[in-house]
Amino acid sequence: MDEEQIWRLCMLAGNQLLRYGAETSRIEETITHFAVSAGIQVEHVQCFVTPTGIFVSMSTAIGTTTRLERVTGSRILDLDKVTQINSLSRQLQSGECSINDAIDQLEQIDNAPLLYSLPVQILAAALSSGSFTIILGGKGTDFIYGAIGGILAQELTRWTVRFVPRFFAVLLASLVGSLFAVLISVLGFSHHEGVIIIGAILPLLPGLAVTNSIRDLLAGDLLAGVARGAEALFTAAAIAVAVALAISLST
């Protein structure tokens, strides 16, 4: 069996898992399963994953080889693809597919569209943002304003993150969403400015980053856990600065 194919399989799977939001321990475990299941040539595997890189050391009959891959580019939360990759590792382990089939399927997974289309994502942002305004004591009209603010914030982030670092994308989106809420209040359409602001920034909150950070820390992956926690902290700081700036501009 071609050792280069095994390396390609492992790095491809790890890269996708990291970009689609899997936690560190899951990525390391899946890469190890792929390597061991790929053929009897692999005797021992060591894997170390950080939020921006993958390090794998693989021992075979002819020696030990270590490789690393830097993971860059945009990251999109898609737990459906994470689940598909994990399922593929089990299929390879049980002998249901070959290494070449697994590589082909990984490429198909990577190129496949997201499980939820853009209109569905927009609808979800609107419902979650609008519903949160009601939970916090807003009225029916606040639901509409919160939904519009959430859509503005989410779609602006999705568009600007292609051109600027995520921190600035979140900062700009939070500012626009907050200014929209301030404008609604200034024009007299609603007296629940704070509630609408909270609804507007809801899609931007770093919930998954915080969750993965805690899971990594509890699993002993301190470097990845601290890095993900710092990422979540900077995102929260960007949101806070934007909201404070919007409120200060209205006074």
Question: What do the predicted segments below correspond to?
Answer:
Residues 74-142, 228-239, 251:
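Alpha-helical transmembrane segments and their cytosolic membrane-interface
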Residues 185-251:
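Generic detector of multi-pass transmembrane helix bundles and their immediately adjacent loops
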Residues 1-97:
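Soluble N-terminal domains of membrane-associated systems
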Residues 108-109, 153-164, 209-222:
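C-terminal ends of transmembrane helices
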